[in-house]
A protein has these predicted regions:
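Signature of N-terminal electron-transfer/Fe-S-associated modules in redox systems
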Residues: 1-186
Length: 186
């Protein structure tokens, strides 16, 4: 059975890549904990518009964990406290407690300049993905894959890398902030 929670959303507001940004806060009341994080942001925007304020800008597309457009920093973590490998749209309010302060920020990387609020320009990153050449060195002659025994633990860990959807969390979270280190597995 869903419970309702109330909390404070502290969200990033910025008019563009060179504008000075700041945090705004809004009290959210009686939000069902089976609400997705993006649905909660939709409710936030409805409340902001009803009170005559400008809505909070964030990006999203599929809302199914496929595209990665919903990528946000939530409480200092890419995508927030989701299940392993999940995206922001797969985060539900049951991960939060009544009375929490939830901080929402854009990706913090020069490779993702801010368009407005938490919407970032992903075009440089998209070009790397579209180029398809994530590895730029020759690997030589590889043995037949069936001839190399791989322990199950290593195979399971490798599968985590194969689930990449190109959201950019690795680049945003990396202190190097370099999209050139991106090694998407496909």
């Amino acid at each position: 059975m869903a419970r309702n929670i109330s909390f404070t959303v502290k969200y990033w507001k910025q008019d563009g890549p060179t504008a000075q940004g700041h945090f705004d806060t809004h009290e959210m009341k009686n939000i069902p904990d089976d609400t997705s994080f993006l649905e909660m942001l939709d409710i936030l925007n409805e409340e902001l518009i009803e009170s005559g304020q400008e809505p909070f800008v964030f990006d999203h597309d599929c809302r199914e964990g496929i595209c990665g457009m919903c990528s946000l920093y939530i409480n200092g973590t890419p995508h927030g406290k989701t299940e392993r490998g999940a995206t922001t749209c797969q985060l539900y309010m049951r991960r939060f407690n009544d009375g929490d302060v939830i901080t929402v920020e854009p990706w913090r990387s020069a490779g993702f300049p801010i368009i407005k609020d938490c919407m970032v320009d992903r075009s440089a990153f998209d070009k790397i993905i579209q180029a398809g050449g994530y590895t730029s060195i020759r690997t030589g002659q590889a043995q037949d894959a069936n001839a190399i025994l791989i322990p199950k633990e290593n195979a399971d860990e490798a599968m985590d890398c194969a689930t990449c959807i190109g959201c950019g969390a690795c680049v945003a979270a990396c202190k190097n902030g370099s999209a050139m280190l991106f090694v998407r597995s496909e």
